[in-house]
Every structure is written in structure tokens, then in C-alpha cells.
């Protein structure tokens, strides 16, 4: 990306209570960055039509018809019948960072990112589903009966932004949200948003245009739709990493278009805003997602109709429950007050994902998006380091940051967070797709309605979940304003590729009523091989999508959501002690929990220093960009401006470091599963944390929790600089899939099956899982070959003793008799061998005698076989390979004194006739290239030389380079044809080295007759041409004769 580009990030909050958060972000940008940063607030009372026009005319060109006419048609919403209540439109925040005014090595490139959320008018929606339209938009918050989104009575009756009733209750609890928004700046004083008004807008009838996509089944959805529009101004990317344009599921990263899509609710696709400093964050960011494939890259926009999209700001709920947060922050405002918490992107590019968090009120601006690859287990792995990032501000800081945005925020730290929930549809497939299809091999095209290429979903049978189970939630998700989530991890049977990459994500915990054991989201793993998942309720719909965009064969981790179990806490007041959701609002209970765990709020603050270390093994896929996988498992996107933005605060803390580990679940193989085996669980009481132990499945129906204590030694930043041991608890919800974990822990960590020995079990689990906050492992083993050769391979016939070693030879019973017998056996064997050798010699002698009687004995045959390679009479010279060469001097001596050898000497001149007539060696015969075959046959093989007489034949041409070697080869070929191999008539054949030219230059006056005529002599050009034509015709004739001989001569009448 070019260094002159700007960067912007735009968020439209669908709740008026987030005005304070917007102002806090603005203040944080202006006070904590060295770059020129501005925030634009669009008042909520602006007309929706005007805002839509602004989207069509601004620099983002979100709905520019010049780039995508179809998308423009699809997103040009008819707003004529929208409710006139303009206060329902959400607040829009645009954060735009200009080029840095200072020079920084980490701020070389910039991006433009723009994200907008807005509610859409009801219109015809055509989700890219592949089942019937009646069941295409399946709601995950429906009743146990399988009802669609339109049929859900809870959705129709409720007037909430999200499909969860908890958000509505949070926004209307004690009217504290309105109070917070009234304390903001004057430009946002009228930005109070009523969620009921938003829902009223969305309840209008469909007046929009029908979708323009071909072969789509239109379906009118009349409630709670939101649009997500993105704009990323960047050139074409390579397919190395991810960027903002491909984050929301667009398939083709090489097409620069403005694109927007609308989707039905059904499942979440979340992302976080990351401001982590990273030097290598602005390289070519691109990968292909499998969420909802369509053309999307670079300058583009994406419109997602979202029912579950909301931004929850805990800071705006100043009720009695939030006062507990302030009290908790008062106890922890000393150590980390100057330390801003920087969130991290963590998301899943599939139809399933987990809720992720980012700070919206007191955090630093969302300037930078991370490029490393987090996963669903990041919440689990990073809980040890990130439990206490929210305990940074006191009550005064909360009031100042919420009500007075003009205050100095140089010491801003984060004590609350927001959650962005972007809804995308989940497809109910009745078929299985390949795990490894790429776009080139049949992937989804942007213009057709085929399902996403690499998807494989298995929908389990839902059953009600046991309400007695205590579900541990993040403390930031208060019971009054949050949604309960259950995360399902990767199953063992589908982990076929490299281990899962896990990236750290800081956990922010506001609620003092939740203990550390309650502050970690639930992570659950389950085997894919279990066909019946009866323990899941309709609120726990599981899907098993596979995403080869992460890596070719690694399926996307399971994700599960729970929408109930928090409704009981939505309308509770200060005395809400219901612990069904682990979100107690009683501060005393939280203190008791902390005391039971041997920690307090001060110790929790001490742990924040452990975030600066990166002790986990470096298993990031950044190191293997040249791997055979299509794209690295890098699911987030980034911008390099964070180093300059946080230049003023990065000197004292290194919050940009990210801990990465590999979680390997292959050791928990499916064959170790046993539904009757026990699992670890955590039983959460009302006033204290639960104990951890081994329980039987009868104690809870097929779902228990695991409480893992990871003990990490951290050094406090306090003045005493004393080292303290912080015990962080991580709660993992497991099913019978992790029954194998119990067996491994029992064998490796020597756990006892006693429920009373809780402390020992916790320590053993800690020693098994912690290892510097990382779980590293090896790749899964390759599958065994099932070929016939492998099956037929047999093990050696060796007797194995009990200790798996060959049995030694027993020599205790040996005696002299046995030794003598062994000696006699050896002599017999030697005699047998000698007799066999003697028989072979006799047979060979008999064969030689028979050959001698036929004048064709073995020795003569061997000699004749060797004669074709070496001469017996003349001294050979190194000439052309495969030919017996002889020098001109040897030929001269032989011709001058024929009596030197007892043989017939013949010199064959292979030149053309005009050359031979011009001059030749004495007594030489002329066999030109044309007609050479017949002449050789007539001259040498019609009456061959007798075997008792030797015949020496010497071939030459002008240079002995072409014509003479050809005649030499022809002569040997004809000799083979007239004899039975290895017998030949003329073993003594030679090739004159240097040809006639060299011989004439040496002995022209003595052994040569005439002169020397060159082949290319100008006086004989006509003769040369005539000879060459004859040679061509002869080659054609010979080719035809060979073809006729090879033909089949069978004729059928």
C-alpha cells in the first residue's frame, strides 16, 4: 500500500447510549497520538435519506453505480415508508487518521478502512441459502420448536436491537443510558437513540427493490436488519494475508469493485478492533474467506443485514450493578492507571464465530487491526494474562470519561468494553462438500448462487440444556447487558493439518461480582464422530464448517452460542444474585470468590505485567509463508499506523506483543471416548466459586466444566518490586469429547478420582496445561497406508521375549557331540557345493566340444564378438565413438608393405564419384552414398571372405565425419543380417582418421592418384546437386520398403 494513503475507521453505533463511548474515543485519539486524527460525528437526527445520499457521494463511494450497478440496485433502499422518527437512526462515528506528522520507522504505510453499521428498511432479502426459502433464515434464538425467523414469537413481540432481550433491558435499565448521553458534548446532545424506534422502523413493510441476483428465492423479512458497509482503499493484493476487504467473506480479492451484500440473521460473524503495535502489519493483506463469497476487495463496500448486531457499552449503564464495577476499579487504580488496554482482533471466517470485544469508551482509537491469526481458543489461552485489564480506572475516571469528553486523557486506561456482533446467515446443508476445493477447482463464483465452496455442516439434534448447569461467562458481559455464549472447539477427528494457531486476546473484566473462574468464556470440544448430540438445546445449535481458506484441510472450529440463560438477569436490580449465568452483581460475592482462590484485586493487577512476555513457542504461520497451503491462517487485518499512534505510550509498556501457541487435540483421539466415563466439571454456587474435581456423568447431564488453574510467576510494577504468584483460573466447558483428556491426565499427571482432592487435581491440571501459558504439540501422524503391499508385508519371524528384545541363544545345553555334528554338517554342505561346481564345469566342457565339432566353438564366438569393437591386426586410435579408428601413417605402412600382416586389405572411398575421379588412394574402391547398400551387398556379401582368411576394410571420405561413418554402419548392419549373432564375416573394419584430406596432405606424391577435389568445389556444383537428389530419393524408397515389411499382410475375403 502506498505511503500517501489515509486511514479511516467508521463505526455507526445503533444505540444512543454509545455517544459517550464515541466521545471517549475522540478524546483518546486527540490526546494520545502523534498523528493528525479527527472524528466526525453524524447526528442521529439527520434524515436517513440524507445519510444514504452521503454514502453515495462521499469519498468511500460505497454505493457508486459506476463500479457495481447491481450492488447499487440491491442497496438503493426505498426509504419512502420508513418511520419519520429520525431519532432511530444510529450514531455514526468516523475516525480518520491522516498522514503522520512525525517520522517513524513503524509508520511507513497507511490504509483507509471504513466500517459503517446502520439499520435497513424492511425489504425483499435474498440470502444465499440453498434450502427452501421457508427454512432458509433459521434463527438460533427460536423456541425449541424449529421456527423460522419470521415465525419466532419472541422476535416479533420484542422491540430490541438484537435478538437477545438482555440488550433491551440493559439499555432501558433505570434510564441511566439517557443520563450518560445527556452529559456528552453539545454536538451529540440530541443523539439519544431509542431501540424501540429502531425496531419500529424495521417493522415496516417491504417497499424496497427485489434482489438482482439470479436464481434467488426472495423472502420478505420484516424485523431487525442492519447493514454493514466496508471500504478499504488499497491496490490489488497478493494472497499472502488478510485485509479488511476480504474479512467479511468476499471471495475474489483481485477485482477492484464496490460491493455490498445483505444477509439474514442466524449466526454471528464477529470481529474486534485492534490497536496493537506491530511493525510488519501493512504487507499485502489478502485471503479468501468462506463466510458469504462474493466479489469483494480493495475499494468496496459490504452491506450485511444484521438482526443480532449491536454494540453494548457497559460504561453507559450506570445502574447499581455498574456501581460495583466502579468500586472494583477503585481498588485497582494504582498500578495500571497509565497502562491502556489494547484489544486484539479475533474472529472466525466461517458461518460460526465467537463474540469478541473491543474497547469503545476509554480505549485508544481503532487505528490498527492485527495481522496475526487468532482462533477460537484465544479466549482460553490468554485468560492467564488478560483477566484484569478492565480494573484500571476508579469511579472518578468513569464519570469523567462518560460525561466530560474534553478532559485530559493522557492517563486513560480501559475499564469497559463493547461488543460488535455482526450477523451472517448459517446454511442448513443436507449434503457434504469437499474440504479442499479451491476457487479454481469449482469454488463459488460471485454471480452464481452455489454455496460457499469449502463448507461441510452437520446439524445436531437439539434438546433442552440442563438449567442447573452453571455457565461461566466473561465478567465484561454483565448479566444486565450481555449475551451468554458457549464456544465449541475443534474436534479431534477433524484436525488433519498443522496445529491450531492461537493468538492472545486481552480479556477485560468489569464486574466485581464475577470471580476469575467466572471470567473466562466457555470453550467446549466435542468429537465429530458422535452423530447424536442430544445434550444441545435449540439455543446451542452446533455447526461443523470446514474452511480450507485457513489451511487446505483444516476445518473451522466449532462454535456454539446460547441465547437464553441470561433472560432471568435482564431485569434484575442491585440484589440480583442469580448465578445461573455466573454474572453475579454482588461485589461481596466477588470478594469471597477472590479470597477462595487466594487472590485479590491487587494481585490481579500484578498479572498485567505477564502480558509483555511472549513465552509461547513461535508457531505463527508468518514463518511459513512458503508453505504448500493456499493461504496462511491469518484471519485478521491490520494497519501500520499504530506505532505512531501509540508512540507516546509505548515506551513504558509493550502491549503489542502477542502470545501464540498451538493447541493440539489429536492426542484426545475418538477411540478413547466413553460416554460413561467421567469428566471434569465446575459447579458454581451463588456466593463462591465452585470446586474442581472428577465427577461422574450422573452429576450433570453430559456437560461439565473444567477448572484449570494456571500458575504464573509475574513481577509486580509496584514500588516494592516484589514478585508475586498469581493464580489464574480458566473455565473450560467440556463434553464427553474430553473424556480422553481425563484419561491422559490420569496417566500423565497422576490425578485421583476423588472429588474431595480438589487442590491436588488443580495442581496436576496446571502442570499439564500451563507450560508458560502455551500448549505446544506436534503435527498429527500421517495415516497408515492401506495398500496391498503394506497389508502383505509381514513381520520377521523372530521370537520376542517379554521385554521386547530377541531371545538370546541358550548355550547351556550344548556339548561336544553337537559341535561334532555341526562340523560334519558344514563339511557336507561344502562337498555339495563342490560337486555342483564340478557338474557345471563338465557341462561347459561338453558344450565347448560340441561347438568345436561344428567349427563354431565358444572361444571363436567370443573372439568374433570382440572383433567388432577392437582390431586384431592394426593399432587402434581414439576416433569417433563406436568406430575403430586408424591413423593415416598406419594405413600408409600397411599399403606400402602388405606382407606385414597376413590379410586382404581393402580401402573403401565413400565420396561422390566426381571426387573419386579427381583423386583417390591407390587401389581404393568407390562406394558413394547413393546406391551404397546394393554395392556393398554385391561387393562383400555375395561371395564373402572365408573364415580362415582375414580381411581388413578401411573406410574414409573427405573428412571421415559423415559419409564414411554411415557406410561403416551400413556394412556392419549387413554383416549382422548375414550371420547369426555374434558371428560376423568381417571383424576387421576401420575408419580412417582425418579422411582423405589428411592422408592426401601427408602422402600425396607416393600413395595417392590424382589430386584432391573438395565436395563443395564450385566447378562441380551441378554434380553435387544431382548426387544429393539421388540420395533423398533413395532414403524415401528405403523408408517405404521398411514400412511395407512392418505392415500386416493378412487379407480377409
UniProtKB/Swiss-Prot annotation:
Cellular component annotations (GO), alphabetically ordered: cytoplasm; nucleus
Catalytic residues as annotated in Swiss-Prot or TrEMBL: 957 (cysteine persulfide intermediate)
Compositionally biased intervals (Low complexity): 131-147, 158-207, 274-295, 306-336, 369-412, 511-522, 564-606, 684-701, 747-777
Keywords: Cell cycle, Cell division, Hydrolase, Mitosis, Phosphoprotein, Protein phosphatase
Gene Ontology terms: biological process: cell division; G2/M transition of mitotic cell cycle; positive regulation of G2/M transition of mitotic cell cycle; positive regulation of G2/MI transition of meiotic cell cycle
Region (Disordered): 125-217, 231-253, 273-412, 438-466, 504-532, 562-638, 684-703, 747-829
InterPro entries, A to Z: MPI_Phosphatase, Rhodanese-like_dom, Rhodanese-like_dom_sf
Bias (Polar residues) ranges: 296-305, 347-365, 617-638, 785-805
Major enzyme class: hydrolase
PTM annotation: Phosphorylated.
Residue span(s) of domain Rhodanese: 901-1001
Signal peptide, first to last residue: none
Function: Tyrosine protein phosphatase which may function as a dosage-dependent inducer in mitotic control.
Family the entry assigns: Belongs to the MPI phosphatase family.
Name recorded for this polypeptide: M-phase inducer phosphatase
Organism: Dictyostelium discoideum (Social amoeba)
Lineage: Eukaryota, Amoebozoa, Evosea, Eumycetozoa, Dictyostelia
Gene behind the chain: cdc25
Amino acid at each position: 500500500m502506498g505511503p500517501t494513503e489515509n486511514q479511516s475507521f467508521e463505526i455507526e453505533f445503533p444505540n444512543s447510549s454509545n455517544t459517550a463511548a464515541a466521545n471517549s474515543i475522540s478524546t483518546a485519539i486527540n490526546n494520545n497520538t502523534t498523528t493528525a486524527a479527527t472524528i466526525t460525528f453524524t447526528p442521529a437526527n439527520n434524515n436517513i435519506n440524507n445519510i444514504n445520499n452521503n454514502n453515495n457521494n462521499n469519498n468511500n463511494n460505497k454505493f457508486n453505480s459506476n463500479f457495481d450497478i447491481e450492488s447499487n440496485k440491491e442497496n438503493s433502499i426505498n426509504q419512502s415508508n420508513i418511520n419519520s422518527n429520525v431519532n432511530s437512526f444510529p450514531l455514526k462515528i468516523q475516525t480518520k487518521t491522516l498522514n503522520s506528522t512525525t517520522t517513524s520507522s513503524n509508520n511507513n504505510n497507511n490504509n483507509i478502512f471504513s466500517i459503517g453499521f446502520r439499520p435497513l428498511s424492511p425489504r425483499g432479502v435474498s440470502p444465499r441459502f440453498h434450502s427452501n426459502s421457508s427454512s432458509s433464515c433459521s434463527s438460533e434464538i427460536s423456541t425449541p420448536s424449529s421456527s423460522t425467523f419470521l415465525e419466532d414469537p419472541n422476535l416479533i413481540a420484542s422491540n430490541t436491537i438484537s435478538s437477545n432481550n438482555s440488550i433491551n433491558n440493559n439499555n432501558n435499565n433505570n434510564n441511566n443510558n439517557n443520563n450518560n448521553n445527556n452529559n456528552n458534548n453539545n454536538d451529540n446532545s440530541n443523539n439519544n437513540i431509542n431501540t424501540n424506534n429502531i425496531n419500529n422502523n424495521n417493522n415496516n413493510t417491504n417497499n424496497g427493490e427485489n434482489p438482482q441476483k439470479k436464481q434467488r428465492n426472495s423472502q420478505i423479512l420484516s424485523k431487525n436488519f442492519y447493514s454493514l458497509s466496508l471500504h478499504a482503499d488499497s491496490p490489488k493484493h497478493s494472497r499472502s494475508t488478510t485485509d479488511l476487504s476480504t474479512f467479511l467473506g468476499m471471495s475474489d480479492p483481485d477485482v477492484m469493485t464496490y460491493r455490498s451484500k445483505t444477509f439474514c440473521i442466524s449466526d454471528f460473524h464477529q470481529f474486534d478492533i485492534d490497536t496493537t503495535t506491530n511493525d510488519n502489519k501493512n504487507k499485502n493483506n489478502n485471503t479468501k474467506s468462506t463466510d458469504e463469497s462474493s466479489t469483494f476487495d480493495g475499494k468496496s463496500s459490504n452491506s450485511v443485514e444484521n438482526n443480532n448486531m449491536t454494540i453494548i457499552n457497559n460504561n453507559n449503564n450506570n445502574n447499581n450493578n455498574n456501581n460495583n464495577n466502579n468500586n472494583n476499579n477503585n481498588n485497582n487504580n494504582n498500578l495500571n492507571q497509565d497502562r491502556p488496554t489494547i484489544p486484539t482482533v479475533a474472529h472466525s471466517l466461517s458461518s460460526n464465530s465467537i463474540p469478541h470485544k473491543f474497547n469503545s469508551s476509554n480505549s485508544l482509537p481503532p487505528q490498527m487491526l492485527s495481522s496475526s491469526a487468532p482462533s477460537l481458543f484465544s479466549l482460553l489461552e490468554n485468560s492467564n494474562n488478560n483477566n484484569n485489564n478492565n480494573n484500571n480506572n476508579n469511579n472518578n475516571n468513569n464519570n469523567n470519561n462518560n460525561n466530560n469528553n474534553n478532559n485530559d486523557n493522557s492517563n486513560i486506561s480501559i475499564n469497559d468494553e463493547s461488543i460488535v456482533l455482526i450477523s451472517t446467515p448459517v446454511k442448513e446443508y443436507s449434503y457434504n462438500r469437499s474440504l479442499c476445493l479451491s476457487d479454481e477447482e469449482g469454488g463459488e463464483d460471485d454471480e452464481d448462487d452455489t454455496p460457499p465452496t469449502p463448507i461441510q455442516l452437520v446439524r445436531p439434534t437439539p434438546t433442552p440444556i440442563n438449567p442447573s448447569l452453571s455457565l461461566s461467562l466473561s465478567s465484561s458481559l454483565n448479566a444486565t447487558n450481555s449475551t451468554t455464549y458457549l464456544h465449541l472447539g475443534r474436534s479431534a477427528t477433524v484436525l488433519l493439518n498443522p496445529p491450531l494457531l492461537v493468538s492472545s486476546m486481552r480479556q477485560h473484566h468489569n464486574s466485581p461480582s464475577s470471580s476469575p473462574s467466572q471470567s473466562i468464556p466457555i470453550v467446549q470440544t466435542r468429537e465429530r464422530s458422535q452423530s447424536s448430540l442430544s445434550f444441545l438445546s435449540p439455543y446451542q445449535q452446533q455447526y461443523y464448517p470446514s474452511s480450507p481458506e485457513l489451511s487446505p484441510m483444516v476445518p473451522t472450529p466449532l462454535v456454539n452460542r446460547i441465547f437464553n440463560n441470561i433472560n432471568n438477569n435482564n431485569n434484575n436490580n442491585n440484589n440480583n444474585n442469580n448465578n445461573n449465568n455466573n454474572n453475579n452483581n454482588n461485589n461481596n460475592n466477588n470478594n469471597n470468590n477472590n479470597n477462595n482462590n487466594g487472590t485479590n484485586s491487587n494481585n490481579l493487577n500484578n498479572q498485567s505485567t505477564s502480558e509483555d512476555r511472549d513465552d509461547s513457542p513461535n508457531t505463527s504461520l508468518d514463518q511459513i509463508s512458503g508453505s504448500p497451503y493456499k493461504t496462511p491462517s491469518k484471519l485478521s487485518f491490520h494497519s501500520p499506523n499504530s506505532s505512531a499512534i501509540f508512540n507516546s505510550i509505548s515506551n513504558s509498556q509493550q502491549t503489542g506483543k502477542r502470545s501464540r501457541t498451538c493447541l493440539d487435540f489429536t492426542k484426545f483421539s475418538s477411540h478413547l471416548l466413553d460416554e460413561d466415563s467421567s469428566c471434569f466439571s465446575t459447579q458454581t454456587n451463588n456466593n463462591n466459586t465452585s470446586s474442581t474435581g472428577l465427577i461422574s456423568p450422573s452429576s450433570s447431564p453430559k456437560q461439565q466444566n473444567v477448572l484449570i488453574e494456571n500458575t504464573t510467576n509475574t513481577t509486580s510494577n509496584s514500588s516494592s518490586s516484589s514478585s508475586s504468584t498469581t493464580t489464574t483460573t480458566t473455565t473450560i466447558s467440556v463434553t464427553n469429547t474430553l473424556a480422553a483428556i481425563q484419561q491422559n491426565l490420569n496417566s500423565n499427571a497422576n490425578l485421583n478420582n476423588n472429588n474431595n482432592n480438589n487442590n491436588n487435581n488443580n495442581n496436576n491440571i496446571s502442570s499439564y496445561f500451563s507450560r508458560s501459558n502455551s500448549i505446544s504439540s506436534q503435527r498429527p501422524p500421517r495415516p497408515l497406508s492401506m495398500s496391498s503391499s503394506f497389508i502383505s508385508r509381514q513381520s520377521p519371524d523372530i521370537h520376542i521375549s517379554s521385554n521386547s528384545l530377541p531371545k538370546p541363544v541358550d548355550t547351556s545345553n550344548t556339548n561336544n557331540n553337537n559341535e561334532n555334528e555341526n562340523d560334519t554338517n558344514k563339511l557336507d554342505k561344502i562337498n555339495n557345493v563342490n560337486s555342483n561346481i564340478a557338474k557345471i564345469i563338465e557341462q561347459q566342457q561338453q558344450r565347448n566340444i560340441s561347438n568345436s565339432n561344428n567349427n563354431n566353438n565358444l572361444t571363436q564366438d567370443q573372439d568374433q564378438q570382440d572383433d567388432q569393437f577392437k582390431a586384431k591386426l592394426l593399432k587402434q586410435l581414439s576416433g569417433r565413438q563406436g568406430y575403430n579408428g586408424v591413423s593415416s601413417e598406419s594405413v600408409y605402412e600397411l599399403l606400402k608393405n602388405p606382407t606385414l600382416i597376413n590379410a586382404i586389405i581393402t580401402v573403401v572411398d565413400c565420396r561422390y564419384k566426381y571426387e573419386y575421379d579427381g583423386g583417390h588412394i591407390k587401389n581404393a574402391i568407390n562406394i558413394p552414398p547413393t546406391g551404397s547398400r546394393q554395392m556393398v551387398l554385391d561387393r562383400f556379401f555375395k561371395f564373402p571372405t572365408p573364415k580362415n582368411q582375414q580381411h581388413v576394410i578401411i573406410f574414409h571420405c573427405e573428412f571421415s565425419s559423415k559419409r564414411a561413418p554411415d557406410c561403416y554402419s551400413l556394412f556392419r548392419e549387413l554383416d549382422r543380417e548375414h550371420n547369426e549373432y555374434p558371428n560376423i564375416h568381417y571383424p576387421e573394419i576401420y575408419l580412417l582418421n582425418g579422411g582423405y584430406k589428411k592422408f592426401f596432405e601427408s602422402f600425396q606424391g607416393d600413395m595417392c592418384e590424382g589430386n584432391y577435389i573438395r565436395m563443395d568445389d564450385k566447378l562441380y556444383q551441378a554434380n553435387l546437386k544431382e548426387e544429393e537428389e539421388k540420395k533423398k530419393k533413395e532414403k524415401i524408397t528405403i523408408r517405404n520398403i521398411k514400412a511395407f515389411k512392418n505392415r500386416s499382410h493378412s487379407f480377409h475375403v
